[in-house]
Design a protein with these regions (language model features):
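Basic, Lys/Arg-enriched alpha-helical interface segments
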Residues: 1-57, 65-70, 76, 81-84
């Protein structure tokens, strides 16, 4: 059962600001979430219910919507700024 991947508009804007080589790595990792959406760690606190995957110094915060078989990338950013 393969999931589809969606990227929130604000996350896409943040991705556009990242260096091209890092963009490609981030896109590859997001693509891999189609096959294994629970690959990332579970977040707590303010980000409860969301998951996180690390890509070098960047983080992708995403939500798995099991009913719709969708992985939604909510935030993409540098590790120092993604949680702000």
């Amino acid at each position: 059962m393969a999931y589809s991947v969606s990227i929130k508009q604000s996350a896409a804007k943040a991705l556009a600001k990242v260096a091209h080589e890092d963009q490609l790595r981030i896109i590859d990792v997001i693509d891999e979430l189609k096959a294994n959406p629970t690959a990332g760690g579970v977040l707590k606190g303010e980000f409860s219910g969301l998951r996180l995957i690390r890509v070098g110094n960047y983080r992708v915060v995403y939500e798995v919507q099991d009913q719709k078989l969708v992985v939604l990338a909510v935030r993409i950013g540098h590790r120092r700024e993604v949680y702000r």
